[in-house]
């Protein structure tokens, strides 16, 4: 696995941040200068220095933040899995491995900062030959394929907040069908006022706590004031089990099953709100695909964005799993530490799930000491500090996005 998150780059740093409940949310001066109501965000620190360690000058010319976060995380996942990054001069192609790399908004920053001003100024010819690969939606997957010589399915997906989860589910399906041995799957999103402006205009991102950034992301809290925008990237290398065992790979966890669906913008569902029945069907479908009982789920890493939808989500989990407050699984929100990383959210949070399974702990959900009244019945299953769970075996990970789209994954700790 590989991760570039607002509160840490690399698995060890990120895992420690999760255990400690360390926030990566900071004040963003540019947002204040541009009169944003929300002036905080989750942005990976020191990324320019990080990517310069990975890529030569020529490659850096075509790496905006969206592609950069994805490329670093994918290379990290590749090497963590025990593979070497091939030399550019090596003509061999790995036909058994592909990549699905998603993003929610993609190259918007490059379009706004470079394409629009230069076109409006009549300077089209000065944009250079690298601009298209930075703004095309498949720029992330294409770049990763070139870095690692991948020859199987190489595509980019986009399903708003569900993107990262969906990439993993699609990759698992590809392997199950016998069409690939391995797939890199994940997502990324750049950090930019041009990406976040629409959400600020909608008043769905946090307009309070600008002077207390680490308190701004408040999933499940009665004082939640909207989500905090974030950025970053993460990838998981998924591999057919026999192949992984034969090569002696380090296996962190199994993907038991997954489900994607849409609520059809009915029964209360809209572009910006989920159809509760669609959410419940998605969770039940993932559990069925995993071949387990709902009672085997030990913990939930929720979508939980710090909006009005949080109590609705908790109730949907309870209904879908048929587990009330008395026997509800642990539930937490990684977004309380990193914000909502949009197309990268599901991928970063999947890595968080696997690290919790591997480490036998449930990370804290920050800033929810004042639980929403409708969530209070579940309070004993909401960790405010890290909880040691040596018997943690099965965790559900969900993503519910704009467009009334839903995704749910079931992970199980690997036990040979």
What are these regions (language model features)?
Residues 30-87, 101, 110, 137-151:
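A glycine- and small-residue-enriched flexible loop/hinge segment at structural boundaries
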Residues 22-27, 212-290, 298-299, 368, ...:
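Condensing-enzyme catalytic core mediating Claisen C-C bond formation in acyl metabolism
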Residues 17, 122-128, 169, 173, ...:
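Glycine-/small-residue-rich "gating" segment that lines the acyl/pantetheine channel
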Residues 70-83, 137-140, 145-148, 154-188, ...:
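Active-site-proximal alpha-helical scaffold in enzymes
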Residues 77-93, 244-251, 282-299, 321-324:
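Phosphate/pyrophosphate-binding loops at sites that engage ATP/ADP/AMP, CoA/4′-phosphopantetheine
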Residues 103-155, 201-206, 309-324:
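Active-site-proximal gating segment of KS-fold condensing enzymes and close homologs
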Residues 1-60, 81, 242-254, 351-366, ...:
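ACP-dependent fatty acid/polyketide chain-elongation machinery
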Residues 29, 179-225, 260-273, 302-311, ...:
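Acyl-CoA/ACP chain-elongation machinery
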